[in-house]
Swiss-Prot record:
Family: Belongs to the dCTP deaminase family.
EC number: 3.5.4.13
Organism: Aeromonas hydrophila subsp. hydrophila (strain ATCC 7966 / DSM 30187 / BCRC 13018 / CCUG 14551 / JCM 1027 / KCTC 2358 / NCIMB 9240 / NCTC 8049)
Protein name per the record: dCTP deaminase
InterPro entries given in the database record: dCTP_deaminase (IPR011962), dUTPase-like_sf (IPR036157), dUTPase_trimeric (IPR033704)
GO biological process terms held by the UniProt record: dUMP biosynthetic process; dUTP biosynthetic process; nucleobase-containing small molecule interconversion
Annotated catalytic residues: E138
Subunit structure, as described in the record: Homotrimer.
Any single Pfam family the record assigns to this protein: DCD
Protein residues bound to dCTP: R110, S111, S112, L113, A114, R115, D128, V136, L137, E138, Y171, K178, Q182
Length: 193
């Protein structure tokens, strides 16, 4: 069952869902909560590795990822990060989100941004039960013009579903959870699979 606005507000009031800083009532509508863009970004450095072998030895994957990913880029409030056509970049939400073991979250991009070519999540839009941390955004500019992205702009919306029961293996209890408590634009850790 997807939570409606009044259920989302109740879960926030009761501390079952935690969003910090807590969004104002104007950002909760129908079935979702608007989330804002954070200040941290990472980009892919072109031509620093010939390829990444996604099924190769984990040490080679880790080395290739380290070569192609930039250090974290901090964009101050009021300034912009420019995402160029065909560019993939990582960023994070401004808010940190914590979910209990019986709720799953879903991140949706904004239609108004998609109509300009911005994909907010390339594929990964599920926020697992037991998740706690900021949400990494996988931006792609499929449009024809560079897009200026500014910290604290509305970037997407979260909605929540109750599970049929409490998850036996929520994210925060899994020993192999690669992105547990992430706070920045964390690069891929596929080498830890």
């Amino acid at each position: 069952m997807r939570l409606c606005d009044t259920d989302i507000e109740r879960h926030l009031d009761e501390g079952k869902i935690v969003i910090e800083p807590r969004p104002g009532i104007e950002r909760i509508s129908g079935v979702s909560v608007d989330v804002l863009l954070g200040n941290e970004f990472r980009v892919f450095r072109d031509h620093t590795a010939p390829y990444i072998d996604l099924s190769g030895p984990s040490s080679e994957m880790a080395d290739a990822i380290d070569r192609v990913m930039s250090d974290e880029i901090h964009v101050p409030d009021g300034e912009a990060f420019y995402l160029h056509p065909g560019q993939l970049a990582l960023a994070v939400t401004y808010e940190s989100v914590t979910l209990p073991a019986d709720i799953v979250g879903w991140l949706d991009g904004r239609s108004s941004l998609a109509r300009l070519g911005l994909m907010v999540h390339v594929t990964a839009h599920r926020i697992d039960p037991g998740w706690s941390g900021r949400i990494v955004l996988e931006f792609y500019n499929g449009g024809k013009l560079p897009l200026a992205l500014r910290p604290k702009m509305k970037i997407g919306a979260l909605n929540f579903e109750m599970l049929s029961g409490v998850a036996a293996r929520p994210y925060n209890k899994r020993e192999n959870a690669k992105y547990k408590s992430q706070q920045g634009a964390v690069a891929s850790r596929i080498n830890q699979d």
